A protein has these predicted regions:
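N-terminal secretory/targeting leader peptides
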Residues: 1-73, 83-309
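General nucleic-acid-binding
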Residues: 76
Length: 309
């Protein structure tokens, strides 16, 4: 959010200044949605899957298991009808959302025990939000929701057995390698997590058009810049984690991934039947995913296969 604030101030020649507060400074970590909705704060920055209790469909606009990658969700939101649906479901809460950052496909996370089979998932206490947490629970694990600032201590002291966070670039900074030995992939639970800038609709409507355009433009630029940064930095950070800090990089067993996939598909399908709004978002999301997956077979997928030979 600091980048958005800086860019908005620069583009508006100082006409608009946004004061950014860190998580917990003025609002609890998971209280951003309510703060913006009520108008106590004009803006907020977070991830939609934290509001699943209020707006279950919001999870599709962050990331869902085995869903859209960063490029794909950008395309769905900006050119595939996703943004219109997003704003439709947030409007009753007096919130105007804008895509505001994506860190790309995540790692599954940090573990203090090996995952060699589905039996190792049973009883596993893991910090994992959103539908990913529901999948873990269905597989026998124990999902825990904790804010980022509490994760290192929780992992180090054994309050949790594992945590997902972002990817090597972020995780190295957080020092998770000092609290857990095993680093698992792939990040099936968050293939393209989109963050959101939440704006109180009354505050938004009070702005002149040129400032609205500046905010939209600045946020769109930061959304892409964030993805570029993580793509450029992740492998360098991963190399350091392995070669300097002795982290053991592990791939989840195929049968574990497949079980997670089957459970994920059922949970998403069941969720889509809960009400008309969720069903509409689900149908749009899945149709876009199916279409882009077909095209990838003759574009990115086939090219990457050819390049890597």
């Amino acid at each position: 959010p600091e980048r958005i604030a800086d860019l908005v101030e620069e583009m508006s020649n100082g006409q608009m200044k946004i004061t950014v507060y860190g998580a917990g400074e003025q609002v609890p970590a998971f209280g951003v949605f309510d703060a913006v909705s009520s108008g106590s704060h004009q803006m907020g920055h977070s991830g939609g899957y934290f509001w699943k209790g209020k707006v279950p469909a919001a999870q599709f606009f962050t990331s869902v298991p085995f869903g859209l990658t960063a490029d794909e969700i950008n395309a769905w939101v900006n050119r595939g009808g996703g943004l219109e649906l997003w704003r439709e479901i947030y409007e009753p809460f007096n919130i105007y959302p804008i895509p505001a950052g994506n860190t790309g496909t995540q790692m599954f996370g940090w573990f203090n025990k090996e995952i060699n089979s589905l039996d190792d998932v049973k009883g596993l206490k893991m910090r994992i939000p959103g539908i990913g947490g529901e999948v873990l629970k269905e597989a026998g694990g124990i999902p825990v929701t904790l804010p980022g600032g509490e994760l290192f201590t929780a992992l180090q002291t054994g309050v949790i057995d594992a945590t997902e966070w972002v990817g090597p670039y972020n995780d190295l900074t957080f020092g998770f390698h000092q609290a857990a030995k095993y680093y698992y992939y792939p990040g099936w639970h968050e293939p393209g997590p989109m963050l959101e800038l939440l704006i109180n609709i009354d505050a938004w409507n009070s702005l002149p058009k040129h400032l609205q355009v500046i905010i939209e433009t600045a946020t769109k630029a930061v959304n892409q810049d964030t993805l570029d940064e993580y793509l450029a930095r992740n492998n360098q950070a991963l190399t350091e984690l392995i070669e300097v800090h002795g982290v053991e990089l592990r791939k989840l067993p195929d049968d574990v991934i497949e079980e997670f996939r089957v459970i994920s598909n059922k949970i998403l399908s069941d969720l889509s039947k809960e009400d008309e709004v969720i069903g509409k978002v689900y149908d749009s999301y899945i149709e876009f995913k199916d279409n882009v997956t077909e095209y990838h077979k003759i574009s990115e997928d086939s090219f990457i296969e050819a390049r890597n030979k």
